[in-house]
Amino acid sequence: MHTHNNFKTPSDEDELDDLDEDMVVGVIAEIEQEVLNESDSDNDEYDLVDMGAPVPDNDGDISYEGNDSSSSDDSFDPNAADSDSDDSMLDEAGGVTAGGATSAKKRKDDDNPSGSNKQPEATFDLDEDDETDETVRAMIAAIKKPRSSPPEIKLEDFITDICFHPDRDIIALATIIGDVHLYEYDNEANKLLRTIEVHSKACRDVEFTEDGRFLLTCSKDKCVMVTDMETEKLKKLYETAHDDAINTLHVLNENLFASGDDAGTVKLWDLRTKNAIFELKELEDQITQLTTNEQSKLLLATSADGYLTTFNISARKMYVQSEPYEEELNCMGVYRGDSKLVVGTSKGRLYTYNWGQFGYHCDMYPGIKSPISLMIPITDRIACVAGEDGNIRACHIAPYRNLGVVGQHNMPIESLDVNASGELIASSSHNNDVRFWNVKYFEDFGDIKYNEKHNAYKEQRHNLPSSKCSNASDFFSDLTKENADGDDDPGAGPSNMA
């Protein structure tokens, strides 16, 4: 406390001038001691104990050790760390204000006397006003709305290919480390059934036989593996099936399948034999896809060197090869009652061929601006294509129309497949995820006429029901509907009275 040497009042100014300086200092010290005693006496015994202060004697006086409070100030060290006794004193002090030092752990233990760390659960209660709010009702409806497709599957390893089982709700996921994961999918949850270690290097393609009994895989290790789905054991191993890394497989029926490698070689296999039925090398670059129609008389192959090559299976020789294209032919599909073949390219184009006339295309559609690397037929006239832009788009075949976006990924799409019923699409991306899209609504799509007017720009950006994005027009249509409802309300708007 800072004190003045001359302590005066206006009434006795002259008398204080004659006082001795030591006497004034003594009087001030006595006043300070009396103030301190009065403030301490206001605290009861229990408060003093909790605060760590000395306990008063029976007569109410407090005993102190040492000379006075100034002596304790001499031993105070501002740089010294707080002692354990100080911490315990702060933790035990209860009922403190915002400036107090109540321990967080102490408060937590007081809230949970049993010692449990479980926090009280938050509840979301709606009153009558909230339940009538349009936004709240829309949120509740979205939460209660049942899922129309299985949830996403996420793996640690890069997914190279996917394939649906023909009879069961099972999907196979091939990975870059050579394993195949079998998942049972459902709208509520997905279940990992088993993981099969099949190859020593990246598994590039996975296929089920038509009856679903066997699982076929090919790899960069040049092998083809056949696994029994019932016993989960290796049925057959075609070791060094190709001289180069195998890129793609195609199942013709329950016994026959074809394979293509990175050097342009195509082979046909029979599960009942040890060696290939025949081998043809008419290309110099990677075989990107193999396919046939229902009759399975011709085997078609697209390649990275820009050729569409057709093989006669029964004659075991090449049937016809197309004119070269200055772009990679990546994928294809058969449509319109096996009368049309459509090929997707690295420039985003779609070429159409009449069946049996594979030398040159009869029609070309610009498609999308990004490369098309995947294509699957959904119906006889609707195809889904995907590629590097991460979008799955639906196209109407002959005539060509962009129907809209089926689904999307944040990264390029690596594989695409449709289940046996044609109602569910699965896609995987470079983000190691598999997403499912319910496309049952395509059953209600009518046929498109050649002379129908359409807006190509709008169609390319239109989001279909399975898409995770909504259209801006849907928002404005809701506003228009609300305005129309308001116009019908006799109590809305200005009065019509004359």
UniProtKB/Swiss-Prot annotation:
Biased composition (Acidic residues): 12-23, 31-48
Composition bias, Low complexity: 67-82, 93-103
GO biological process, one term: defense response to Gram-negative bacterium
Keyword terms, alphabetized: Repeat, WD repeat
Region ranges (Disordered): 1-131, 478-498
One Pfam entry name: WDR55
WD repeat start and end residues: 154-193, 198-237, 241-279, 282-321, 324-363, 408-447
Keyword Repeat: yes
Family per record: Belongs to the WD repeat WDR55 family.
UniProt name for this protein: WD repeat-containing protein 55 homolog
Organism: Drosophila melanogaster (Fruit fly)
Native organism taxonomy: Eukaryota, Metazoa, Ecdysozoa, Arthropoda, Hexapoda
